[in-house]
């Protein structure tokens, strides 16, 4: 559960990084973050999850993993790839 909790903190911060430039991605991730935290807190206080709750928690967690990795790609890799692709297309003309 420690790994889940550590990643949940990182996933919760993802919309903050995306808010200014990519608001649609940030708004898409917010419902999954809320679901993930509600189910994680219910698991911590009740001590167990039923099969459906467990499946929904893992689904929300993995959707947040995908959104966070996409956000990292958009924020950090895309600015470096974009100038190279422009020079490549300009050289083709």
From Swiss-Prot:
Membrane-related topology note: Multi-pass membrane protein
Stretches assigned to coiled coil: none
Keyword list, A-Z: Cell membrane, Germination, Membrane, Transmembrane, Transmembrane helix
Keyword presence, Transit peptide: no
Principal subcellular localisation of the protein: membrane
Stretches that traverse the bilayer: 1-21, 30-50, 56-76
Xref: InterPro entries: Spore_morphogenesis_YwcE
Localization (cell): Spore membrane; Spore outer membrane; Cell membrane
Pfam families listed in its UniProt record: YwcE (PF17368)
Gene Ontology CC terms, in alphabetical order: outer endospore membrane; plasma membrane
Role of this protein: Required for proper spore morphogenesis. Important for spore germination.
Family the entry assigns: Belongs to the YwcE family.
Protein known as: Spore morphogenesis and germination protein YwcE
Species, as recorded: Halalkalibacterium halodurans (strain ATCC BAA-125 / DSM 18197 / FERM 7344 / JCM 9153 / C-125)
